[in-house]
């Protein structure tokens, strides 16, 4: 904690501050004759022109904040903060409102967990903007950039930020009732004792704004011995800005989104069914797949948007087989004679499917390998024979290559080959276990899922800390575009938007309340 601000400055020093037109307000103290209720102290974080303040009304348990500051964003923050030092698992909940609709539409009122009072501190917050936009913001390293996951709920009545172990998540309520999980479950490294509180930034250094926080609840949650409650969140991430947008969250397990060819809806699987829902959000609708009622997470639309490839386990001793159905639903048509078979890619001309299959189970050489088969029917062609697991085959948009992942070198890495299986070559060479390469519509980028090396190369489990990484096809230098709690079912199948600007994926969370 920084020292108290000196109230009376020498004239020369004061003149310097006035000339600069800015005040570094680090006044960490409670008001002289009032309580801050649940919190211990208040003050401005970062550089502000106009000092903020807080008034606490004990009779209504309401905090009225005034605050200035450029923003809570990028690499440094400037805002009014009211806090308490805590550690461990935390839940902070409040109703938040702005008294006026004027000012910057992106003024922010926040519920925050923060490592320190430095402007560039590690933090996570749930922020509601003046225009109603709501997001889980986070900076996971000191001096790093702020990132966010935008909620699909605008102007929620009640907001919550919660920390469980190393993870944080947001919960929101549109009207009366308790907030429900709305996405997040991010690993944010808060060490030891950290700051928990409420804050306000005007998003305009020359303006002072106001916000009200009522029905504030702050609890230190003891670890629960009960079974976790599992949630899945359908999200999209912009590959350029890495901003994330929540499409749908539910207290259930669903997986593996595809983008429709026209960009209007997303396809995913849940409880043996394949569903679709608008990209803008809404209620998922089941796609009729007839007798195929045990569909897994390997599915995707044809290039001409008339058919949907599915992988289903309802026949032949529940081994997976590949089928096609009309994109709007209908009777499945069987494509693969042999099982288990798991679809992964369409050829650009829509005439061939790439899939993963295991043959001669229990015998030598029964590894999962890459196969192709004509959509119109015919014999399958085996393309890989290397020892170990091969998975995730997907055609490049120009039809020149099939990209896939293979553990043949001892770790799971991305490979590619010609569509006849020739010229197999390794693409990634790093310490991660890399799965499910997906090529951008223009053929310039690869996105894939990376597990840390504490996971077996041949395994891709659920509920792990994983990275979604983006890599140019020509330079092969990858960067992280999303830190995700997920794994199996996150991006198993092609998930680029048709315009190549976003990736759809599923993240998971598990809470014990």
Spell out what each predicted region is.
Residues 4, 64, 102-103, 169, ...:
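Short amphipathic alpha-helical segments with coiled-coil-like heptad repeat character
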Residues 5-8, 117, 142, 166, ...:
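Sequence-pattern detector for short linear motifs
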Residues 10-23:
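Bacterial N-terminal signal peptides
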């Amino acid at each position: 904690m920084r020292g108290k601000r000196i109230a009376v400055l020498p004239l020369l020093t004061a003149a310097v501050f006035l000339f600069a037109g800015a005040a570094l307000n680090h006044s960490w103290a409670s008001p002289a004759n009032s309580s801050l209720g649940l919190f211990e102290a208040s003050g401005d974080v970062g550089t502000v022109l106009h000092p903020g303040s807080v008034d606490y009304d004990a009779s209504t348990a309401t905090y009225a904040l005034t605050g200035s500051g450029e923003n809570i964003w990028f690499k440094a923050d400037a805002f009014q903060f009211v806090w308490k030092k805590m550690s461990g698992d935390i839940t902070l909940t409040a109703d938040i409102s702005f008294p006026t609709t004027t000012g910057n539409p992106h003024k922010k009122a926040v519920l925050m967990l923060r490592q320190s009072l430095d402007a560039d501190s590690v933090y996570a917050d749930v922020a509601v903007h003046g225009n109603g936009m709501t997001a889980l913001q986070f900076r996971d390293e000191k001096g790093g950039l702020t990132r966010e996951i935008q909620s699909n709920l605008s102007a929620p009545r009640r907001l919550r930020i919660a920390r469980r172990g190393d993870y944080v998540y947001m919960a929101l309520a549109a009207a009366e009732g308790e907030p429900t999980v709305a996405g997040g479950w991010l690993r944010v490294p808060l060490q030891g004792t950290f700051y928990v509180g409420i804050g306000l930034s005007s998003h305009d250094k020359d303006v002072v704004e106001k916000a009200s926080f009522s029905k504030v609840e702050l609890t230190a949650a003891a670890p629960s011995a009960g079974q976790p409650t599992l949630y899945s969140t359908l999200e999209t991430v912009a590959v350029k800005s890495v901003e994330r947008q929540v499409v749908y969250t539910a207290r259930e397990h669903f997986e593996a989104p595809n983008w429709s060819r026209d960009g209007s809806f997303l396809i995913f699987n849940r409880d043996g069914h394949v569903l679709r829902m608008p990209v803008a959000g809404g209620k998922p609708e089941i796609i009729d797949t007839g007798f195929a009622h045990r569909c897994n997470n390997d599915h995707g639309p044809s290039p001409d948007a008339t058919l949907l490839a599915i992988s289903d386990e309802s026949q032949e001793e529940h081994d997976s087989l590949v089928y096609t159905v009309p994109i709007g639903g209908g009777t499945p048509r069987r494509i693969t004679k042999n099982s288990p078979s798991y679809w992964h890619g369409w050829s650009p001309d829509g005439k061939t499917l790439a899939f993963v299959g295991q043959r001669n189970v229990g015998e030598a050489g029964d590894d999962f390998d890459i196969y192709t088969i004509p959509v119109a029917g015919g014999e399958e062609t085996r393309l890989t024979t290397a020892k170990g697991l091969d998975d995730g085959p997907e055609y490049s948009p120009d039809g020149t290559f099939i990209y896939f992942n293979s553990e043949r070198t001892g770790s799971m890495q991305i490979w590619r080959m010609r569509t006849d299986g020739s010229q197999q070559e390794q693409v990634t060479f790093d310490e991660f276990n890399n799965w499910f390469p997906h090529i951008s519509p223009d053929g310039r980028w690869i996105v894939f899922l990376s597990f840390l090396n504490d996971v077996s190369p041949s395994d891709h489990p659920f509920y792990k800390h994983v990275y979604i990484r983006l890599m140019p096809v020509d330079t092969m230098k990858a960067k992280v575009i999303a830190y995700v709690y997920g794994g199996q079912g996150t991006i198993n199948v092609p998930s680029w938007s048709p315009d190549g600007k976003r990736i759809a994926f599923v993240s998971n969370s598990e809470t014990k309340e």
